[in-house]
Amino acid sequence: MEKLLGYYYKWNVDSIWTYTTNESGLFYVPIRSDLDVFSFEIKAVDNDTLIDPTPATIVLPIRNSKPTIDFRFRSNPSVDDIGGDTSFTFPTRTFVWDVQDQDGVETITDIYFALDDTCSTCWTQLSAAAFSSITLNELEPGNHTFYLKARDIAGAESEIIQFPDSNNPSEPDYWKVLPIQGNTLLVDDFVQDSQNNAQEWYRSVLDTALGNLNFSVWEIGKELPYSSTDLSATLNYFDHVIWYTAYTGGETYLDASSNIYNYVAAGGNVFLNLTELKDSTFIFFPLDTSFTLNPQGRIFSDRKLISQISNSLDLTISSLIAVRVKGFIPNSTQFAEIQTLYTMDEPGNGDEWTGTPTISSMGQFQVSPSQLSGKVVLMSIPMHNGSVPLLDGNGSGGKFISYLLKVAFQ
């Protein structure tokens, strides 16, 4: 008794028949024009290997669909995150995208991007199969626009998308590349300080230590760059980084932990003034333990921070610290070298800590048998609260930053 075993099928673009036992299938056809015509043939085979001599045939006119391309969700900054209409970056910027095509993403063959101009010779071609992002380096300072489009195997192109796009109200209207000034980067991770009072204080400190505007400033906002490549590139433009965080939360430094560690491991020096120690397992500054100095949320003015380097660097709290802060003990086994820089003075009336807890240390890692990392300094007492400086009771607290830049980091 004859029994159906399977089928042989072939498209007109195929040179051989293909055997299958399936009774349905999804096929990709290589459409190469706006409208193309394909024929499909199929014939049955039985258990005596007899093949239907008259294959069934269908002719299909197929219209090509244009591809679409979009920037990946949240890969460009939002107005809400940056708090303004301009996105500022340094000379490295990564763009990330996703493509779609009703005919199948495999029909998309090319991605094209352009910077500032969409003339016919301005586009750079990328393989759609190999690239879903591009990192632009050595960008010239000033305003820029990035353009992007996709092309499929039939030559159909997507609509051009761009960043910035004035028609997108959720994204900034301008993208401005900042020049690299000096070898020191000031990182403003204090999003609540909308008036930039803390930033102005740090700027004045760096003006005194390094000379007027002989440094660069990066104001992060609510979110770090989408691409970790951009964050690392920004840090690596500089020899030294001064990173200060919010007085009452909202900082981003913990999400940058790996970038900070890699920066230090590569030889960079960083000072982190962190009001809130979010984690005791910082890879950039391993801690054995941390503990709250003021469970009631107050440290009064005139309390002293005692320098372990020189009494000329002693600091005095100049205004009430009205948030809980921590002392800490570094995990010395994780450092090649570790040095205490500041401790709290003995507690006075109303103080809640005991002894002289450490609130600032400097460490280095062993990155190879013969090489140490750059230096990482952690300080857990805030230097500014967004309204007034907090450590200016014995001369400017900036003398400590000046010491780091001129002595410790050299």
Question: Where are each of the predicted segments found?
Answer:
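Solvent-exposed loop/turn segments flanking beta-strands in beta-repeat/beta-sandwich domains
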Residues: 1-13, 100-118
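Helical hinge/lid and interdomain linker segments adjacent to catalytic or ligand-binding clefts
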Residues: 194-282
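A glycine-rich, often tryptophan-bearing local segment used as a flexible ligand/cofactor-contacting loop or short
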Residues: 247-345
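Short, solvent-exposed loop/turn segments at the edges of extracellular beta-sandwich modules
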Residues: 45-51, 151-161
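Surface-exposed, short loops/turns at beta-strand junctions within beta-sandwich domains
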Residues: 29-37, 136-143
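Short beta-strand segments within Ig-like beta-sandwich modules, predominantly Fibronectin type-III
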Residues: 16-25, 122-130
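Hydrophobic/tyrosine-rich beta-strand signature of extracellular beta-sandwich/beta-rich modules
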Residues: 38-44, 144-150
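Extracellular ligand-binding/catalytic regions of CAZymes and related secreted enzymes
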Residues: 350-410
